[in-house]
Amino acid sequence: MKKMLLTAIVCLISALASGSDGTGVLGERVCKDVKPFSALNISNCCNVVYEQGDEYKVRVVAEKALLDSIADIADCKVVGGMLVVSVKNVNAGFLSSLERVDFKHGEVFVNGVPYVRVRKEVTVYVTAPNINRFLCQGNGSLRVDKMDADNVEFFVSDAGSLRADKMDTDNVEFFVSGAGSVDIKQLNANDATFHVSCSGSGLVDVRCTGTLLCNVSGAGSIEFSGTAAKFDKIVSGCGSVCCSELRCSDKKVMGKNKACSEGERLVFGDVE
């Protein structure tokens, strides 16, 4: 039995070693006939960059060898006004969901897909005038360089992650659960609400002219810096809120668990 297992492992290593080797040279594929959408759903092992623009456009950037081998490397479709994006698990070399290795015409196939050793991750660039709802789940990763919107919602779950450089919005609401994470360099908003549960986490620099509301439960944690006219927090379970770098003009901290968490210091004064 041990001998058979060892033989199988050796065959597997040999098969993967004989797969096509990507050169690192990037190529691009544009998804055709993309219908208008106002919501974005990211799943699977998918890296997505949202670029706000005048047109609706989806383009896939990956190693050229990978694009040549796998015609349908990215699945992009609009359902009920929502763009659903998923990518075949190539960033991890298929090893994370390994089921079978096949040989066809001298090529190696893992889980029925041509195996290519990649050096760079697959990235999907999404362009749209305005998206008001983002869903990031599984191992999905969303990056927002800059966006301007009236009302927007973000749902980050499982091991999903959201990274943003600058957001300008009237009202924004974040739902972070599972092992989801949020990292926002600059958030300018009238009202901002954060719901963080399970082991979700957040790191946010905010400029809030209205109310900043934070609801943390389970083992969730979030850290704020910047300014807010009003700050309201509700903390339960082992959740924690750190706002040692948050300046708030309202001297009354509302909500349950009013006492500051360990290491937390609210600085009160006029918000510039």
In which residue ranges do the predicted regions lie?
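Short, flexible, glycine/charge-rich loop motifs used to bind or transfer phosphoryl groups or to couple energy/partner
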Residues: 29-30, 124, 142-143, 162, ...
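Compositionally biased regions
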Residues: 15, 19-21, 142, 158, ...
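Sec-dependent N-terminal signal peptides
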Residues: 4-13
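Histidine/lysine/aspartate-rich catalytic loop segments that bind and position anionic ligands
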Residues: 151, 160-196, 200
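Acidic (Asp/Glu) and glycine-rich low-complexity loops/linkers
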Residues: 18-137, 143-155, 168-175, 190-192, ...
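Short, surface-exposed interaction patches in beta-rich subdomains
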Residues: 182-272
